[in-house]
């Protein structure tokens, strides 16, 4: 009897898009300390495949687990949930207009 695999899906923020067809996604999770019960914020980075180079730094994306695509890449970008604000874009417009 075959077991159906549950696909892992995570939501995170793109922290780097310097590589070709690859982005680094930081996924943040809240965990409770086992002894003190304080909620701790933990961040883990995943390298994800971005086929069309559509993601930019600051975007919030949904990634899904897939077969190994390279030495460290085991995730792929499913969708871009929200576009991140590009820093410095407004400043450039002001200097051109003014």
From Swiss-Prot:
Entry keyword set: Ribonucleoprotein, Ribosomal protein, RNA-binding, rRNA-binding
One Gene Ontology term of the molecular function aspect: rRNA binding
CDD domains: Ribosomal_uS17
Gene Ontology CC annotations of this record: cytosolic small ribosomal subunit
Residues in the signal sequence: none
A Pfam family recorded for this sequence: Ribosomal_S17
GO terms for biological process, alphabetical: translation
Function: One of the primary rRNA binding proteins, it binds specifically to the 5'-end of 16S ribosomal RNA.
Name used for this protein in its record: Small ribosomal subunit protein uS17
Native organism: Carboxydothermus hydrogenoformans (strain ATCC BAA-161 / DSM 6008 / Z-2901)
Lineage, highest ranks first: Bacteria, Bacillati, Bacillota, Clostridia, Thermoanaerobacterales
């Amino acid at each position: 009897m075959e077991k159906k695999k549950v696909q892992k899906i995570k939501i995170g923020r793109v922290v780097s898009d310097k590589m070709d067809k690859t982005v680094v996604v930081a996924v943040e999770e809240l965990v409770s300390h086992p002894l003190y019960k304080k909620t701790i914020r933990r961040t883990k980075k995943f390298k994800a495949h971005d086929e069309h180079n559509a993601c930019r730094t600051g975007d919030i994306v949904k990634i899904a687990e897939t077969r190994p695509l390279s030495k460290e890449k085991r995730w792929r970008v499913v969708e871009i949930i929200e576009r991140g604000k590009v820093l410095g874009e407004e400043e450039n417009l002001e200097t051109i207009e003014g």
